[in-house]
């Protein structure tokens, strides 16, 4: 959620557009709400470490999101070594956790 002028409720939409290209190397895109387990009745009530911006809370969220992205990568037969770019949207400083957690996963 944005810090300034946040909407009344969460929302995020993403899409990928692809076209065939001869000679192109295989590629992939993974997107989505990684901070909530899939299949829940609503988003807000199931956010991992909801509202906890302590170092322990942020670390819990980072670990959950990275594990969820690993699950999605595995479903495509991929791993962190295949990832060429990652975008993370947050107002909190998670860099210390991302560095240690990604390296531990072989990224």
Where are these regions (language model features)?
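Short, polar/acidic, helix-capping and beta-turn segments at strand->helix junctions
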Residues: 1-107
């Amino acid at each position: 959620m944005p810090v300034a002028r946040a909407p009344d409720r969460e929302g995020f939409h993403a899409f990928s557009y692809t076209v065939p290209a001869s000679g192109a190397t295989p590629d992939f895109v993974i997107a989505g709400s990684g901070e909530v387990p899939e299949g829940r009745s609503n988003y807000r009530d199931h956010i991992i470490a909801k509202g906890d911006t302590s170092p322990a809370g942020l670390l819990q969220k980072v670990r959950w999101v990275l594990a969820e992205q690993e699950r999605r990568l595995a479903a495509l037969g991929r791993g962190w070594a295949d990832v060429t770019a990652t975008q993370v949207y947050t107002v909190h400083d998670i860099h210390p956790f991302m560095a240690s957690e990604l390296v531990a996963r072989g990224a």
